[in-house]
Amino acid sequence: MTDAPVKRIRNFCIIAHIDHGKSTLADRLLQDTGTVANRDMQEQFLDNMELERERGITIKLQAARMKYKAADGEEYVLNLIDTPGHVDFSYEVSRSLQACEGALLVVDASQGVEAQTLANVYMALENDLEIIPVLNKIDLPGADPDRIKEEIEAIIGLDCSNAIPCSAKTGLGVPEILQSVVDRVPPPADTVKEPTKALIFDSYYDPYRGVIVYFRVMSGSISRKDKVLLMASNKTYELDEVGIMAPDEKKVDELHAGEVGYLAASIKAVADARVGDTITLLNEPADAPLPGYAEAKPMVFCGLFPTEADQYPDLREALHKLQLSDAALKFEPETSSAMGFGFRCGFLGLLHMEIVQERLEREYNLDLIVTAPSVIYNVNLTNGEQILVDNPATLPDPQQRESIEEPYVRMEIYAPNDFNGALMGLCQERRGEYLDMKYITKERVTLIYELPLAEVVTDFFDQMKTRTQGYASMEYHLIGYRKNELVRLDVLINAERADPLTTIVHRDKAYNVGKGLVEKLKELIPRQQFKIPLQASIGSRIIASTSISAIRKDVLAKCYGGDISRKKKLLKKQAKGKKRMKAMGKVDVPQEAFMAVLKLNQTP
């Protein structure tokens, strides 16, 4: 049994937007409580992945147990559960909030409240968490704590009279934060005597011990010798070890209600111990699992192909290894006439897709071609069936389908009101439907739109940042499917369909997108010795075309004057050769062409 009674345990997390200083504040808390010695300290201590440190974002959750001597002379155990701040990982955030009783709301004193922070704060309020506002970066010259306090009160309705000003960089205000966690965050409920239930809020794959599961004991207790049952996956395991994160793993014999720890039980893959699952004892199982469990559903799909065909087995192995530690990643083999063998992969969102791609290239030294991201469409066929399509190239022909439904999201954009026009223009270009506009303060506004997800996953985020000089932030969630006039746009290169360039677009946009595609390809595909026609088509109808002219060899150079029939004979021979070359010739599309098409702005 660990040494802390339930009334002296505090479980809390930090809610903050990207770049508002969450990981730095976590570092200071670890340092101030003596959990990490100063000499071992490195920046962003809880962000273990190299990629996390580099991008300055938290991808996987971490947890740390700190001991703190409070003003009343008692020693308290503070469990800090770190959360990712990005919209792609909102399910992970909701699970880690369920494991806490309180939250520090960290807001940059020079920037104010951002969209993703708000989404997480509302989630925290739904879970009845005690929220402590913290104004970070008050040492910056542009800091305006009073304005930010007003903003938090206006937007969230939180009383900010006792908000804590701090600077995570210099350590100012950190002792006050620790004391207020003890004073204001309620202790966990004393449910040691009830049947054992523990919530999995994170897990990672260790090549030697299998999956390490991070959990919070909600009721009862878990000890090292127990046999446990995971209620959602219905799998049973014998525990090898149980322990706490301080922040390095440290074995203990038992953890009771209210405590946060880890367990190892030779679990093969992260998919067997999913985030949100309930752990209970095999011989005395709980009646019902903890509420809120949901399977991770991929929202964005794309094809991943190795640039060299012989790297295919390496890519397969790398994806299998990544899947051991990332249960949200889905993939299946796919072949394409233009690209050879590869995989169709599903991701939570664009950031998740970029991270997986970057990890494959960085950790496994693979060179990849990525096709344009697409979403899942519901296709109603003429025979009454309904199928799901995640690859535009597999969409049935127009004669076979009745209608196509695409996923829609409700989006809230927070921005200074100078950029209203630019943002409304962007949303309209992306087929957005205006719902509402609210002024939060005199300077800031919230725009609420409903948009097709397909319009968001291309480059909406980049465009939003560009048009608002980086000031806007957004948050969105899926609201269901709607029927739309959608068509499959194919690209034909030398009369052959190039599958990876196939997209599904709205009929009204098809011409502009098709024209943009063929023009872009004309710039990027190198000239051959024969003419290459480039066409964009909907079904059998060509809607845009251009061609790359041939490189000509001057066959008349050696004729100097002479008989005209001799020249004609040579030109005829050349034309015949070109005709044969055109029939036999294969056009190699360079990788830049695929990449440029991804970047092609889809706005008309």
UniProtKB/Swiss-Prot annotation:
Residues 7-189 form the tr-type G domain. Its main location: membrane. It is a peripheral membrane protein. PROSITE patterns: G_TR_1 (PS00301), G_TR_2 (PS51722). One of its GO terms (molecular function) is ribosome binding. One of its GO terms (cellular component) is plasma membrane. Pfam families: EFG_C, GTP_EFTU, GTP_EFTU_D2, LepA_C. It comes from the Bacteria. It is found in: Cell inner membrane. GTP binds at residues 19-24, 136-139. PANTHER family: TRANSLATION FACTOR GUF1 HOMOLOG, CHLOROPLASTIC, TRANSLATION FACTOR GUF1-RELATED. Required for accurate and efficient protein synthesis under certain stress conditions. May act as a fidelity factor of the translation reaction, by catalyzing a one-codon backward translocation of tRNAs on improperly translocated ribosomes. Back-translocation proceeds from a post-translocation (POST) complex to a pre-translocation (PRE) complex, thus giving elongation factor G a second chance to translocate the tRNAs correctly. Binds to ribosomes in a GTP-dependent manner. NCBIfam families: lepA, small_GTP. Belongs to the TRAFAC class translation factor GTPase superfamily. Classic translation factor GTPase family. LepA subfamily. This is Elongation factor 4. It comes from Synechococcus sp. (strain CC9311).
